[in-house]
């Protein structure tokens, strides 16, 4: 089981897989956020999303949590979730695309959002979706200064490659399945 943020409607999910759709934000032209559909104050929506995420993760008890792009979540909604999951022993990884903005803009944003602090306190690793031969994200964004966190470029996703689950122990999924790419059609 896993928790997915985003739209998965219309996608056939395999047995044992489900999704939770969170109430959405809408970004206004001035850059501020509001509730997309619900008639509630933004602070209440942030709290609702945070509580929903925490409840789902508590129920699922994942070994691995991959946070996409924004270390503290949209509008800091993961601020209570991450320390709780960390205390439960969940391995927490930030998935980060290689080119976000200029290094200066990223440095300002990360400083304002206190991203380095939450990374040091709650994350085990950063996976960079990119190739350092194309763009050196680690140096450009100062990720090399996160001493206790493993920062790894994992390459680009190729939609033409298929993923298949293989067990690293030769057994079933419950005793150590890992995902590997395969060149098979």
Regions found by a protein language model. Name each.
Residues 66, 93-95, 127:
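Structural motif
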Residues 97-185:
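A nucleotide-sugar donor-handling region in carbohydrate enzymes
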Residues 54-75:
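Short N-terminal targeting/anchoring amphipathic segment
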Residues 16-17, 62, 89, 122-124, ...:
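Short, well-ordered alpha-helix to beta-strand connector turns
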Residues 75-85:
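Short Gly/Thr/Asp-enriched flexible loops that form oxyanion-binding sites at enzyme active sites
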Residues 83-99:
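Active-site proximal beta-strand in glycosyltransferases
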Residues 2-44, 48-50, 55:
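Conserved nucleotide-sugar phosphate-binding/catalytic loop shared by glycosyltransferases and other
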């Amino acid at each position: 089981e896993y928790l997915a943020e985003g739209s998965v409607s219309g996608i056939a999910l395999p047995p044992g897989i489900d999704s939770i759709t969170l109430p959405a934000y809408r970004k206004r032209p001035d850059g501020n956020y509001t509730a997309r559909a619900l008639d509630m104050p933004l602070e209440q929506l942030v709290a609702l999303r945070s509580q929903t995420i925490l409840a789902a993760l508590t129920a699922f008890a994942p070994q691995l949590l991959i946070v996409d792009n924004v270390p503290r979540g949209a509008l800091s909604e993961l601020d209570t979730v991450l320390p709780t999951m960390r205390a439960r022993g969940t391995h927490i990884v930030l998935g980060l695309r290689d080119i976000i903005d200029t290094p200066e803009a990223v440095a300002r944003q990360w400083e304002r959002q206190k991203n380095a602090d939450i990374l040091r306190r709650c994350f085990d690793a950063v996976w960079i979706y990119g190739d350092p031969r194309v763009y050196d994200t680690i140096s450009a964004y100062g990720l090399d200064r996160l001493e206790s966190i493993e920062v790894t470029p994992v390459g680009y996703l190729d939609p033409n490659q298929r993923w298949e689950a293989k067990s690293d122990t030769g057994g079933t999924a419950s005793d150590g399945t890992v995902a590997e790419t395969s060149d098979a059609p």
